[in-house]
């Protein structure tokens, strides 16, 4: 069955607009995906007809809002096949989820002389929190290097582990190269050394199904806004036994059981003790609608369509004069490139004049830029609403830029 891309596009109102007098070709979904009417309408309806503060309210609106929020927690747990909805913490996004783990589990479990393993392809959100933790604790940060094709040098991984390795923190899919890392093999190796595993799933959950039980990771985190949902909301999954042992990171309302000026404070049970303050309830409702949307289309069908489009894009882009493509042949979601010796910002500005939106810069992956010896790259990302025609426009635009700039 053919993927209904035109029907999907009709659900995204922003795709009907023009930029610089030309139809918008939005090739920046890896930074943040556009939102379908179903998400916009669900969040709008909540604010119009159902808004109230959640938790402890005895009135109807509060009870309904609380129930709606907790239903999304259950829905998200099914989406990633968690064992229990109580293994999921609502966070602002992937970055906050990783910082929560670093400041809660990490503070409790990392000691001087311990080490944490990351890779050279990580987003800054999966580098900086571990650097800060290691500096605080006197621990060591170890790095898995890259092959020139943008895959990890896994033959070096075993040597990085030892009896002081406490955590492997690894991206599921690179936000620059599109490399999908072989998590089962990497997690199995971590288990041999008794290390925990955190997976940054920000660039994975929109492209194919994720099963955290099958992966057997300890932590998995992703953002709603890359999954066609609202900004400011994400999910942190933690194995239940581990989550129940973790101390809270932030203090405030909703995360307590009792508060006394003389007897101190006791915490709510997990996951609620990690959700201090008023939650982004509207964002949570929107996230639920986004999960409904991609589930109704079928992640397998989305993935098949995107892979077909990716193969076509790589074939066509390879024909552009003086282009350098970064990353492996088999990839998900993104194509990073440079055009001759022209700065990525200049190329991106020209493309914007043609109505084509791509991302330029270091993509929050400065160590990866340093490895390739470039200050920046252009990145085109492909989502379920992109088309062959938009790929053709990108190729034509780059060919024209090459002709104009030489």
Swiss-Prot record:
The keyword Nucleotide-binding does not apply. Its main location: cytoplasm. Its EC number is 2.8.1.7, 4.4.1.16. It catalyses: (sulfur carrier)-H + L-cysteine = (sulfur carrier)-SH + L-alanine; L-selenocysteine + AH2 = hydrogenselenide + L-alanine + A + H(+). Its cofactor is pyridoxal 5'-phosphate. The active site is at residue 364. GO terms for biological process: cysteine metabolic process. The modification N6-(pyridoxal phosphate)lysine is found at residue 226. Belongs to the class-V pyridoxal-phosphate-dependent aminotransferase family. Csd subfamily. HAMAP family: SufS_aminotrans_5. This is Cysteine desulfurase. The gene is sufS.
